[in-house]
Every structure is written in structure tokens, then in C-alpha cells.
């Protein structure tokens, strides 16, 4: 391994920490976060085809408390989205997923966790699909029960059925829930394809 590689990894990690600290430190930075429609923020947009999953501008204080904003900021939605996706992409680049394999060593799913609420926003970043399509193929299924937890499955021959209750539990116990809706991510973009909520079908 090149002696420069460890330094590069440390540099990237420190950059991510600094960006997250800037976002979470004073509670003044605008972030575009995913959440559930039950949150009822003053300004929101639904993900494509979603009934329960929204994007909303927010600030996050030092302790991680979310405060929805009444407007996306001076630059509008585009500036807020560009800045948030840049931070989310850097967070994604420094987050190692837990890769789950079956008894034959076949990769079944990936689970992403992080302290930052921007983790869920990372599914909208340009780097998310290339990173996981290299593992699961060109079409992915995503479950986002919380802002700091994302499940990634291949679209076909996946373990989603066996994980339904675990994902529901994650949603119910999380202090930062998103929704139980399921999403397909492909070169065509992100779209809602179903739900794990038995009462919302």
C-alpha cells in the first residue's frame, strides 16, 4: 500500500468531521433532511411517488436536535440541495457499510449507519448509486427507517422479506424516524415502490 493512502484517508475523514461539525455546531446551517410527513414542517417536498417521505430544510444543533426552517434560505432550494448533497456525499465516502452475506458468501444487503442525520440525504447524492450498483447491480431497493440508518438491497433475489420486522423496529424506536416506504434507485432516478407499513397499503 502506498504510504500516501493512509494520509489521504485521514485527510478525507477529518474533512468530513469538519463539515459535519460546521453543519451541527451552532444550529444555524441549513440542511436538507429526509423525514416523515407526520413531522409537518412549514416547508417540505415529497420524494417522487412518496406519501410519507419528505425533504425539508432544517437546522441541527450541537446535540443533534432538528429545527425545521420556514424557508430554504437565501439561495433557494437549489443552493440548499447542492450544499447538503455535497456534505452528504463526503459523509457517504467516509462511511463503511456493514455487508451481510448468506451462508454461501453471497452478498445479500448493506446496512449504513452514522451519527449524522445527513446519512439519509446521501441516497440522493450522485455517488450513492455507483457505489452500491457495483455490489448489487444497476437497480437497488432502499429502506430508510431513520435519518441515520439506510438499508440497501439488490432489486432481485433480495432478503427484504426477512428484514421487514427489523426495519419496522428501527423506525419505531428511532428518535429521528423517516418512513417505512421502499424506494427503487436506478439510472432513471429515485422512486417510491411500496411500503413496509401493514396499515398503509
Where are these regions (language model features)?
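Contiguous interface-forming segments/domains that mediate binding rather than catalysis
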Residues: 24-201
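Bacterial N-terminal signal peptides
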Residues: 11-19
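Serine/proline-rich low-complexity intrinsically disordered segments, especially terminal tails, linkers
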Residues: 4-5, 17, 181
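Bacterial N-terminal signal peptides that target proteins for export
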Residues: 1-11
Amino acid at each position: 500500500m502506498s504510504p500516501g493512502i493512509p494520509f489521504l484517508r485521514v485527510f478525507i475523514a477529518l474533512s468530513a468531521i469538519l463539515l459535519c461539525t460546521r453543519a451541527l455546531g451552532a444550529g444555524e446551517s441549513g440542511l436538507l433532511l429526509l423525514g416523515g410527513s407526520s413531522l409537518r414542517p412549514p416547508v417540505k417536498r415529497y420524494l417522487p411517488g412518496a406519501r410519507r417521505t419528505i425533504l425539508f430544510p432544517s437546522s441541527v444543533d450541537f446535540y443533534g436536535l432538528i429545527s425545521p426552517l420556514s424557508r430554504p434560505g437565501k439561495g433557494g432550494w437549489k443552493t440548499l440541495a447542492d450544499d447538503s448533497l455535497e456534505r452528504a456525499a463526503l459523509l457517504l465516502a467516509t462511511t463503511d457499510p456493514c455487508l451481510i452475506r448468506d451462508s454461501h458468501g453471497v452478498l445479500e444487503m448493506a446496512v449504513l449507519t452514522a451519527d449524522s442525520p445527513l446519512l439519509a440525504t446521501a441516497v440522493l447524492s450522485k455517488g450513492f448509486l455507483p457505489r452500491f450498483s457495483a455490489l448489487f447491480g444497476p437497480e437497488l431497493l432502499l429502506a430508510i427507517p431513520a435519518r441515520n440508518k439506510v438499508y440497501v438491497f439488490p432489486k432481485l433475489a433480495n432478503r427484504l422479506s426477512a428484514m421487514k420486522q427489523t426495519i419496522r423496529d428501527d423506525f419505531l424506536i428511532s428518535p429521528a424516524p423517516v418512513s417505512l416506504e421502499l424506494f427503487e434507485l436506478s439510472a432513471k432516478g429515485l422512486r417510491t415502490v411500496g411500503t413496509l407499513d401493514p396499515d398503509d397499503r
